[in-house]
């Protein structure tokens, strides 16, 4: 067989920022990024360029500009650009990064691995590291049991989304902590550090579709110095299987507090289960516009305790105002369903109270008031139902 042509074979190596245009068929190695390229051009080629060869070091998601939203199941491809001929094209990496998962940051969710650092890292990187709006996105918690042995600090503007109560579970078991989860400012600072530096106090935090559980006797969710926050379709529980017969360490499932600097206001719970603790909810400090709607309070010494420790000084000058519990269910509560020691405009409306304030002896054994407004003005029970004979 006659030899028609012998082509020159040449390889180059160097750093990626000094990679020249390679000759047609010439191979170049970028030693710093460990990526390999081959030159393309000349007759028959659509353009002169360096093409990357896929290796174990290639970032396929970054280099693949192949995603275009279509939604073909509706019967036609959606138009994403100015016209059908110019669709919006994004890399797969950009598409996947639209939603962040705690597993992207190392959380496992197997109930055995300590996920504290991984979850706090995810919260910091997405919501606290840079105060740029476009960096924020929903933080997704796939179904699993996330063991935490330290305090989870949820910064301002965080949006946490699980796959439903008893499917996504955050489980805290460190008795030395002040809570399993606590709201933090925009720099992930808590307690006396809230608002220091350029930190914005806790605000517009959303938690949706998960269980937050304490396996030890500590508060479960601590909402402190916060404004305009929403907890939807969640279980917030301790570790009591039945209503405690004493206050114990007086820890609540939900603890809401203020300081002299920041008064908590406009906190909304919707369709949540709260209890299995000494108290379901403890509200002592000055605060206003606290609303529980469609919730289930169960297995507690008292379901909701309001304004017991009013001192006349900040942060507990007069106690909570405008606390409303509506369309909710109270069940297996040893003492009062609602006990307002101090506070104005406390309202219970259209709730049902089952086996409440009977010392767990059944509805024919009343021990105290189901609803007790001890002091304050403008407090009412409207349209409530009771199972007492």
Question: Which role fits each region the language model picked out?
Answer:
Residues 149-151, 165, 171-178, 215-221, ...:
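Short glycine/acidic-rich loop motifs that flank beta-strands on beta-rich extracellular proteins
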Residues 102-140:
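Acidic Gly/Asp/Thr-rich repetitive segments characteristic of extracellular carbohydrate-active
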Residues 141, 159-163, 202-208, 229-233, ...:
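All-beta strand scaffolds that present successive hydrophobic residues in beta-strands
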Residues 21-38, 119-126, 142:
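Short hydrophobic/aromatic-rich beta-strand motifs
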Residues 13, 62-82, 88-118:
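Right-handed parallel beta-helix/beta-solenoid
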Residues 124-159, 163-175, 211-216:
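N-terminal extracellular ligand-recognition/capping segment immediately after the signal peptide
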Residues 107-118, 159-218, 237-245, 249-252:
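Right-handed parallel beta-helix/beta-spiral solenoid domain characteristic of secreted/periplasmic
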Residues 1-27, 33, 48-59:
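Extracellular/surface-exposed low-complexity repeats and stalk/linker segments enriched in Gly/Pro
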